[in-house]
Every structure is written in C-alpha cells, then in structure tokens.
Amino acid sequence: MKSQLNILLGGLGLFALQGCKTPQAEQAQQPNVIYVFPDQFRNQAMEFWGQEGFREKVNFRNDPVHTPRLNDFARESLVLTSAMSNCPLSSPHRGSLLTGMYPNKSGIPLNCNSNRPISSLREDVDCVSDVFSNAGYDCAYFGKLHADFPTPNDPQRPGKYVEDRIPAWDAYTPKDRRHGFNYWYAYGTFDEHKNPHYWDTDGKRHDPREWSPLHESGKVISYLKNEGNVRDPKKPFFIMVGMNPPHSPYRSLDDCMEQDFNLYKDQPLDSLLIRPNADSKMAKAESVRYYFASVTGVDRAFGQILDALKELGLDKNTIVVFSSDHGETMCSQHTDDPKNSPFAESMNVPFLVRFPDKIQPRLDDLMLSSPDIMPTLLGLAGLSDSIPANVQGHNYAPLFFNEKADIVRPAGALYIQNVDGKKDEDGKVRSYFPSSRGFKSARYTLALYV
C-alpha cells in the first residue's frame, strides 16, 4: 500500500511539474532556425532535379552538377520549384530578406557601395533578426552581408574605409547596426574566395587562408558546439549563413576547390551548358567549370553543417532552409549579365525547407517572393503574431505545414530592376531610376524597360 501511495504521489508530482513549466523549459521547445543562402546559386544547379520524383514535376533540365548533400536534403524537405528573387541582385534581395519589404521600402534599391548613400538597410525597421532576438533567440550572422552603405569606420584604421578602392564596396557593420544579431562573424562584400576576411562580434578582423564556404561552415559548427561559450545554450538560435561562392569570380583555382573542379575539368563545354538557350561559344563559357565546382563545394560545406546538427542532436528541432539571393544566367539568354534580369536563370532560386515531423517532404510550385521569406520564417518558428505591421511579404507558413491550407497563392512574382539616378556634385547617387518593371507567372514573363 505504501509503495502504491509513493507511486501515486510521484505521478502527481510529475504531473504538477509538467503543468508548471518554467519559461526556460518553454523556450527550449522553440525551434532553432538556420538559413543558408550562397550567392548567385541558380535553382537549376541542383542535381536532384534530374532524379526520379523530381524531374517529372518541373519543366526544366537540371545542370549536370554534383550535389550529393542537397540531393539527400531535398528528399527530407519541402522543395519549392518556383521561388523568385524579385530584384535579382545581391543587396536588394538581402534587404527584402531581412525586412520583408520590396526594395523601394527596405532602404536598398541598388547594390550597396560608398557612392550610393541612398542604398543601405534601414535602421528604423525591425528586421527578421530583431524579431527573433526579441523572442528570446540567440542570433548569429556568418559571411557576406552586403546590406550596408560603406563608411570610413574601419576598426583597425579609424577614419578610413575597410578597403582602398573607390567606390568602396566592402563594409564593416558596427554593433548598433546589426539588428539583433548578438554573434557576428561577417563582412560586407569581398570576392577573393580563398583569401576572405571577417570582423567578429567585437570588431576584430580575421584573415583565414581558406576557401570561404568551408571556413564559414567550420565557424557555424563551432557556434553550434558552443566552443568558447559564445551562445546561451538555454536559448534557441537563429543563424544566417551568407556564403559568397558560387558568385563570381569563377575563372581559376583561386575561386574554387581543386577536388571539385576535377569533376568538371575534362567535360566538353556543350555537355555542361545544356540549357536549350545556352551558347557554349560565348567568351564566358569556360567559367561554367569553375561555377559548377563552386556549387559542389557549397554543397559539401552545407552538408558539414547538417552533419553537425545531427551529431549534436539538434536536427529534430531545427528548421533548416537552403536558398540564394539570385541566380546566374551562365551563357543563357544571349546575355553577359549573370543576374539582374527577368529570365528564369536569374530570378528562380533554390528554396528547400526541412523541419522533421512538422513539414512533410514534397514539391510545391508556390511562387514565393523575396519579401515573403521573412514573415514565413517567423511563422514557421511560431512567431506569426510578432510579424511587423509594415512587412509587405506574406506568411506562407500555414501552407508549408499543410499543403491543403486555406491560403491564397500568388498568381506570380514582380520583377524589379533599378539603376543609378541623379548624382550630386561629388558623384554620390541621390536617387534611383526604375529602369524595368515586370511580372512573372508560371507561364509568361512580362518586363517593360525605360
């Protein structure tokens, strides 16, 4: 009788504990979020599109690339066939990604450099990282940001830009402009892929001699392992990883890993440039080998992060997204411009979301736009009520969780292209000119140029 009473009391005690969770215990149940977005990674450059279960669902051929980790990840994920970068250029997309706004509202209508003071991430809006931070998340940014107007604020050389070229493109982002990111290992923009540099949380510069995606994946893994006690293990985390490759340059082994280049070096160009609108005789055609090599290297770096999540037991409660800021035409469409155009090669970006036991692996033709990403990420993390009122994008988390959700799907996606407008006497751009506006549906693309 006494033992039965002890069991009963113990059970009641356990019930009471379960009914009175501490804030920390509740917080621990919030999902972690990792958003990985290499630069200039087109949607077609993923091997799984040519595999059974995928190829019959799309109307394009995949590039002949090797992406074994993305192949496996796709079979565990919701994969969008038609995610679009509305203004397919680095800084404007990043502005939309962070704010949930189109370029005319985010503060970033043009690529950021020191001649464009009108193009810089707004300080007076809550970015996705601000919302996560306010919800109790540890927030970390790794890699390329390219969302700030460069100023002469080099921590190592006060009063100077972080680079000597004019205009300056690279930038140091001080703590008061990091929008809730409490851990920082990032830079503005810099295109020496095996000679990258980063500023850490305290402004110290690091110059590793390592291919940047692999270096960044290593730093992310150190963060996940909490080496150096860099995060609060009681808090969920929100991580953004802005890898630079396969962004140009893509012309030598200085730009990619040799082991990846060897997969493509002996392939005839017309066996690599297989899109029906591609021209293997263009001067740029040789670049495809280095571009695809970088794609394969990014795949490997991404896989290392996935392996660490599993090893640490974090994979089940972590939302992982793989995407890009825009695509790459790579000898298609008779243009030398790799981006900033209404073509599918430029606008159509990867968008894969894995959330084990919460999101069913499948394909969906949702035409997700750049401003939709921020509110959708917040919705996936259970923070729909915290989406700022000024966000222009839509929260498609209900559709991600349930493909039959009663939600209006977009009929298409806007296309936006801006160029420099009026300049002052010092050559600074003081306005932008809307050079093209358009609309892309599942079947048609309309783009009007001025």
Predicted regions and their residues:
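Formylglycine-dependent sulfatase
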Residues: 2-5, 9-13, 20-449
